[in-house]
C-alpha cells in the first residue's frame, strides 16, 4: 500500500504512473545507480551500460578465448569473426550497401571525428555545422580551413536552443560547386539535449 504522501503525489501528478515501465527498467538494468545513490545524466555523451549487457559480455568472454584479429590461429579467427559480424550488423542497421560503405572502428568518437577531418576531401569545398556540435566536431573545421574550405556555423535560437531553420535552409541551398560539401549536426545536442530533425 503506497504511503499517504505518495498517494497525494499521484493525485497531484497522475502522469507519473506512466513512468512505471522506466522505473522497472532502472531497477532491473541499472540497480547499481540506486545502490550507490547516483543519478546519471550524461546519456548524450556516453550511454550507461545495462546489467544484461554485462551478463552477456561476461558469458561471451568466459566461454571463448579471443586473440589478435590480425592473425590466423583459432583464437584470432574467433575474434575476426566477431569483428566482421559487428561490421555487417552496423551496415545492415543503417541500410548501408557493403559494396559502397565500410564500418571502421576507432577508440572513441573523437578519434572517429579526427579521422574524418584528416581524410575528407575539403579542398575548395564547404563545411557547414551547427553551433551546438560536440567540441570534436568543431575541431574538424581546422582541417577544413587548412584545405581551403569555407566553414559556416548555423546559429541556435533562444530560448529553446533550436537551430535557426530559415538560416539552415538558406545555407543548404548554396553548396560549394567546386568541391565537396559536408554538413555536421548532432542528432541530439549534448549541450542543450535538443533533438534535431534527422531529415536534414
Can you describe what each PLM-predicted range is?
Residues 1-200:
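Pyridoxal 5′-phosphate
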Amino acid at each position: 500500500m503506497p504511503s499517504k504522501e505518495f498517494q497525494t503525489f499521484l493525485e497531484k501528478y497522475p502522469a507519473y504512473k506512466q513512468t512505471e515501465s522506466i522505473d522497472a527498467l532502472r531497477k532491473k538494468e541499472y540497480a547499481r545507480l540506486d545502490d550507490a545513490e547516483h543519478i546519471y545524466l550524461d546519456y548524450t555523451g556516453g550511454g550507461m551500460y545495462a546489467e544484461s549487457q554485462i551478463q552477456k559480455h561476461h558469458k561471451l568472454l568466459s566461454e571463448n578465448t579471443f586473440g589478435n584479429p590480425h592473425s590466423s590461429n583459432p583464437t584470432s579467427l574467433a575474434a575476426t569473426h566477431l569483428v566482421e559480424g559487428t561490421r555487417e550488423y552496423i551496415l545492415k542497421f543503417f541500410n548501408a550497401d557493403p559494396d559502397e560503405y565500410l564500418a571502421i572502428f576507432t577508440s572513441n568518437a573523437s578519434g572517429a571525428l579526427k579521422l574524418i577531418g584528416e581524410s575528407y576531401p575539403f579542398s575548395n569545398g564547404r563545411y557547414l555545422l551547427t553551433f551546438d556540435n560536440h567540441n570534436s566536431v568543431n575541431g574538424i573545421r581546422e582541417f577544413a580551413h587548412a584545405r581551403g574550405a569555407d566553414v559556416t556555423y548555423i546559429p541556435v535560437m533562444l530560448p529553446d536552443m533550436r537551430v535557426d531553420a530559415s538560416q539552415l535552409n538558406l545555407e543548404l541551398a548554396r553548396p560549394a560547386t567546386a568541391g565537396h560539401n559536408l554538413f555536421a549536426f548532432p542528432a541530439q545536442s549534448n549541450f542543450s539535449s535538443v533533438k534535431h530533425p534527422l531529415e536534414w
